[in-house]
Design a protein with these regions (language model features):
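Hydrophobic transmembrane alpha-helices
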Residues: 8-69
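Short, functional N-terminal and low-complexity linear motifs
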Residues: 21-27, 70, 102, 150-155
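Juxtamembrane loop-helix boundary motifs flanking transmembrane segments in multi-pass membrane proteins
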Residues: 8-16, 72, 156-160, 164
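Non-catalytic, surface-exposed connector residues within folded enzymatic/regulatory domains
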Residues: 70-71, 179
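Short linear sequence motifs
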Residues: 1, 12, 23, 156-158, ...
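Membrane-embedded alpha-helical hairpins and interfacial helices in multi-pass inner-membrane proteins
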Residues: 38-47, 76-97, 102-198
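Small-polar-interrupted transmembrane alpha-helices in polytopic inner-membrane proteins
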Residues: 30, 71-79
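Short, charged juxtamembrane terminal tails flanking transmembrane helices
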Residues: 2-17, 186-198
Length: 198
């Protein structure tokens, strides 16, 4: 039987005020952590090779459904802030829309697969690795990059090689952060009994 949208997103599983409060805290933490990562790691927080340390927080989607809107809104805030700070203008909207969609998809799948945490958190790796590289060549060309970073492959007419490079590089960066930082965080949250029962 198909449930309602509210049960699909876990709203029915906890009091509404708690759900909204958790989502707000998660959004604020994710946005702040992403902006701090941007300031400290600069180019490694955005682009074809990413180590967005804040992605470690995505694992909370395995313990609370409030992470679905929380991470999505946090990602929107961080990507809008990056668009303003970096001056990407309208091109930055690609990241706001599609990068946030990748986070949303990863969060929904992670929540749905939460009984298998190691697989569940991998949903963020898959979503980001498949979606972000699809618009990255357009964004990079608009910012004045004409070759695939770290190679001599021209972006012009090389969409498929650029996409494949992005799948690998974005996937590796996401996997390192999710599994090296996020999985221990998830384990610690569960041990500290911070995770609500699901």
């Amino acid at each position: 039987m198909v449930g309602t949208a509210s049960s699909f997103f876990g709203v029915a599983e906890m009091p509404r005020t708690r759900y909204i409060a958790q989502a707000g805290v998660i959004a604020a933490l994710y946005a702040a952590a992403t902006l701090i990562t941007m300031m400290l790691l600069q180019g490694l927080a955005w682009g074809p090779v990413q180590f967005r340390i804040s992605e470690a927080l995505c694992v909370v989607a395995a313990i609370t459904p409030a992470a679905i809107p929380g991470l999505t809104v946090g990602c929107v805030i961080a990507n809008v802030a990056n668009m303003v700070i970096s001056g990407t203008g309208a091109l930055g909207m690609l990241d706001v829309v599609f990068g946030s969609a990748a986070t949303f998809i990863g969060a929904v799948l992670c929540w749905r697969l939460r009984k298998r945490p190691a697989i569940a958190i991998g949903c963020f790796v898959a979503a980001n690795a498949l979606i972000v590289p699809a618009y990255l060549p357009i964004l990079l060309q608009g910012l004045g990059f004409y070759t695939i970073p770290f190679t001599d492959i021209s972006i012009d007419g090389a969409y498929l090689p650029m996409y494949l490079f992005g799948v690998i590089s974005t996937g590796i960066g996401e996997a390192v952060v999710i599994y090296a930082l996020g999985l221990p965080l998830l384990t610690a949250l569960k041990r500290a009994n911070i995770a609500p029962s699901s």
